[in-house]
Amino acid sequence: MFSFFNKTMSNNTETFFDLNVNLISGDALNLSKLKGKTILLVNVASNCGFTKQYDDLQNLHESYKNKGLVVIGMPSNQFGGQEPGSEKEIKKFCETNFNITFQMTSKYDVKGDNAHPIYIWAKETFGKSTVPKWNFHKILILSLIHI
């Protein structure tokens, strides 16, 4: 599943770039620092049949990070309990098995009442198609500049 958005399409006064997220490293990321970039947000899991997509995500990160693409992985255990590990275990798994260097967030819910505000924003702004139905759902947020 893939959701594709242009932040300028929203009627919601809050944007993606007004939000924050905690990283798996323990640091906080203010998403306003990513203005002017294109964001690929992916809910991820270590024990999923789609986990091999980490290789592709890392390749995208390496190929396009200098051209304005930011890949963010958001671990979630909401689909089949396929991300049961601690954040330390998730980080080690990703680095050891896939040499992940793109941003990874803390583990969050990505659907329902306790979903991370990014996913609540996406659903309220763009509708139900943004709600992940399984692991490795992708949301692409374009940051277009209009003159």
Where are the regions that the model predicts?
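Terminal helix/beta-alpha structural elements that buttress the NAD(P)+-binding lobe
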Residues: 16-18, 106, 120, 140
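Conserved small/polar residues in nucleotide/adenosyl-binding loops
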Residues: 145-147
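Short loop/turn motifs at secondary-structure junctions and domain boundaries
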Residues: 11-13, 129-132
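N-terminal "domain-start" segment that seeds a small globular fold
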Residues: 2-32, 52
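Short, acidic, Ser/Thr-enriched surface-loop or helix-capping motifs
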Residues: 23, 141-143
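Structural micro-motif
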Residues: 100-102, 115-119, 130-139
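Short active-site neighborhood of thiol/selenol oxidoreductases, capturing the structured segment around
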Residues: 33-49, 70-75
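Structural microenvironment flanking redox-active thiols in thiol-disulfide oxidoreductases
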Residues: 50-115
